[in-house]
Design a protein with these regions (language model features):
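Residue-level signature of outer-membrane beta-barrel architecture
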Residues: 44, 62-66, 97-99, 132-134, ...
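Outer-membrane beta-barrel "beta-signal"
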Residues: 212, 238-253
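Transmembrane beta-strand segments of Gram-negative outer membrane beta-barrel proteins
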Residues: 30-46, 70
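Residues that define the transmembrane beta-barrel architecture of outer-membrane proteins
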Residues: 34-36, 52-56, 87-91, 122-126, ...
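Cleavable N-terminal export/targeting peptides
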Residues: 1-33, 251-253
Length: 253
């Protein structure tokens, strides 16, 4: 039995307040034949003086693989405070199961979420899908995935402006990895989520990442872009992030 631990340390430079309506599980998915995988990331910032800013972020994955079965648990948390006012205290957790069909797979997931930055008290998802490989050679690949999911959201709970939304959505996503040189590669993901009975209501997530590999770690930069065509409360429909960081891989048998 093989065990593997992967530690990620990130430096975060936010362009806007982060919207966590769509979660990219691909970026935390370690490509490994290990039986167990644990991946974690931490980053933070403290500023004092004219402005007092506290920021802390953590993303974690625990994965178990047996034969063609893969079970993954994702837990993410973000906290931002400015002048002792909480701007963000957001969490996302997702339990995901995948069954491999050679280069393809079927999957199911359940997800829970809270996002103060979006006035989102709770968001619960249940979904299934199919992932198809279109191209694969060495580390280069192109996959697409499609599946429906159930969405239950509560905004501004316990207020006169509370909004409770139940949707059924279709999710279409693509996953692309291209090896530029022996040590430099590009990984890009794209998610498109469409409301089943209102095609004017859709969400988009786009994240390209450039990574450079050294002997025992990688450095990278990535841009995260999110868009919701019809927000259900008075918030911005677009947000983005620019991140720089490195990963360190520690493994043992």
């Amino acid at each position: 039995m093989k065990y593997r631990i992967i530690w990620l340390f990130l430096v975060l430079f936010p362009l806007q307040i982060v919207c966590q309506s769509i979660v990219n599980t691909e970026s935390m998915s370690a490509k490994s034949d290990s039986t167990f995988v644990f991946t974690t990331s931490f980053d933070g910032n403290y500023t004092s003086g004219n402005i007092e800013l506290i920021q802390f972020n953590s993303a974690n994955q625990l994965a178990y693989k047996y034969d063609r079965n893969l079970v993954r648990l994702f837990i993410n948390y973000e906290y931002i405070s400015q002048d002792k006012e909480t701007l963000s205290s957001d969490y996302t957790s997702q339990l995901r199961y995948s069954y491999s069909l050679k280069n393809n797979s079927v999957y199911s997931f359940i997800q829970g979420q809270k996002a103060v930055s979006l006035s989102l008290n709770s968001r619960y998802l249940v979904g299934i899908g199919y992932r198809q490989n279109l191209y694969k050679k060495d580390k280069n690949y192109l996959d697409v995935a499609f599946g429906p999911f159930y969405e239950n959201e509560m905004y501004l709970k316990n207020s006169e402006s509370s909004v409770h939304v139940i949707n059924y959505r279709y999710s279409l996503s693509s996953f692309f990895n291209f090896k530029i040189t022996d040590k430099l590669e590009n990984n890009t993901v794209f998610y498109y989520q469409l409301k089943s009975n209102d095609f004017q209501d859709y969400r988009i997530y786009f994240e390209p990442k450039i990574a450079y590999s050294f002997e025992h770690f990688k450095i990278y930069t990535t841009l995260r872009y999110r868009f919701h065509s019809t927000p259900y409360v008075e918030i911005k429909n677009t947000d983005s992030q620019l991140l720089f960081g490195f990963t360190y891989d520690l493994g043992f048998n």
